[in-house]
Amino acid sequence: TKTKKIIKNIKVNWKGSTGIHTHDNMGKALENSIEAINNSVNWIDCTVTGMGRGPGNTKTEYLILELKRKNEKSEKLVHLLNLIKNYFEPLKDKYKWGSNPFYYFAGLNSIHPSFVQGMLGDDSFQPEDIYSNLNYLSTVGGKKFSDELISLGKNFYKKVIKGSWKPVNLIKDK
């Protein structure tokens, strides 16, 4: 896998401890973290419910369940599950973090996740607007984030006209 190749290349010249921090844009954060464990990475960066910017990171609770399958200790899992239910889920609902189809589409098309984050945080963007803008970004290139590109998409749907050229001026006085 790509994760295995990256770890192998790092370990050629680095003999110290290694770790991994994965994002969940395409739903592979856990898979890549497990692959890292299987390739002797020393630490895995994870967050409760995957809390993080945009689609988030490897979910601690999922990683614990995977490690439990490998006979690792996980006696504190019930405490973590209660913490999630009572504190993290309400925050997740309030601040709307986590994976969704828009982040996945962005990942498939090498679009910077800040585009998705910006549109999701703006109530004037409806799902069809977000999807249409992401389709546009997939054709013009969205690897580098730009507020201007989000504004263009927003203005397109709001019918805000920018510029001074008017076709009526071409036929005026004729």
Predicted regions: what they are:
Residues 1-174:
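Catalytic cores and adjacent flexible loops of soluble metabolic enzymes
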